[in-house]
Amino acid sequence: MKKSDFHYDLPEELIAQAPLAERAASRLLVVPPTPAAFSDRQVRDLPELLQPGDLLIFNDTRVIPARLFGQKASGGRVEILIERLLGGQQARAQIGASKSPKAGSVIALDAGGQAEVLGRDGEFYLLRFDIPAPLEHWLLDAGRLPLPPYIRREPGLDDRERYQTVFAREVGAVAAPTAGLHFDEALLARLRERGVEFGHVTLHVGAGTFQPVRVDALDKHVMHTEWLNVGAALVEQVRRTRARGGRVIAVGTTVVRSLESAWRKTDDAPHGELQPFAGETQIFILPGYRIRSVDAMVTNFHLPESTLLMMVSAFAGCDRIFAAYAHAIAQRYRFFSYGDAMLLWSREWGIGNGES
């Protein structure tokens, strides 16, 4: 399978550059299993599309203002994108500079203080910050929001709110779990009234999510790592949902990535079941992989040739996804982080219940 198998042409004007005034006003392309027809709805219609007893699972990670600027001792300008907070005033980061900084070099930060380069960690750098407050708190004032590169404008004050889900609480992401951006408090209240339950996982979206696949042969692609936590309470929620005949719906690809990383075969469940898990994942989901943990997902439209497009193709089938994307382009849907969404149903109904 090749990266080029996942190419499509997108008119640039369909790339959303800013969010709509109302979160839940985004359009929602409902994609049921073949041969049922697509339907054009809005995210605010979700209470009509879901059933009492269904479980929506959100990613509760919180985006940090992870972009910093500074200057090397030589005078060269530096851009820093923090990929992960490591504790003890240390972080792993990408650095953009005319020449790669060496271990031991010091970067004077525009926001005050400095960062020492401790060394390399693969494509990343390890940095130690000399600043007047704990790094996590200091970044709230000193850092800039790392909007995706296809949003061709500087972040504004509104982005501090709108590039964050209303349920974000666990600090650590450098990019938003964008499917969750469509949910506001009013929609959540209506879903509760409908009898839909909510659960949460945490996956800290890393800078690797912005990196393109650099090889055409997908078996040569090295997937980036991200930290996640699927707690015991969420596992129990999923079990209760299955027992009552409810459906499990992931809000975003990061939730699917989390749940599939926590899927384990056991003596009682030879086909696998969800287990509590906290740690790193490098899972790469592409067609040929069977997603067992969810029945449906709410997800935005993804970049051509991206690993996220490969994941949704594994879930619903390549032909179905590309037909849906063609429909979305023809109907002038808005694409990517601040764009519209899909409600995507699995092409293999019942797999989430552990069937082979």
UniProtKB/Swiss-Prot annotation:
GO cellular component, one term: cytoplasm
Key words of the record: Cytoplasm, Queuosine biosynthesis, S-adenosyl-L-methionine, Transferase
Extent of the signal sequence: none
EC top class, as a word: transferase
Catalysed conversion reaction: 7-aminomethyl-7-carbaguanosine(34) in tRNA + S-adenosyl-L-methionine = epoxyqueuosine(34) in tRNA + adenine + L-methionine + 2 H(+)
EC assignment: 2.4.99.17
Keyword RNA-binding found: no
Biological process (GO), any one: queuosine biosynthetic process
Subcellular localization, as worded in the UniProt entry: Cytoplasm
Metal-binding as UniProt keyword: no
Any one GO molecular function term: S-adenosylmethionine:tRNA ribosyltransferase-isomerase activity
Xref: Pfam families: Queuosine_synth
Annotated coiled-coil segments of the chain: none
Pathway terms, separated by semicolons: tRNA modification; tRNA-queuosine biosynthesis
Function comment: Transfers and isomerizes the ribose moiety from AdoMet to the 7-aminomethyl group of 7-deazaguanine (preQ1-tRNA) to give epoxyqueuosine (oQ-tRNA).
Subunit-structure text: Monomer.
Family the UniProt entry places it in: Belongs to the QueA family.
Protein name per the record: S-adenosylmethionine:tRNA ribosyltransferase-isomerase
Organism of derivation: Xanthomonas campestris pv. campestris (strain B100)
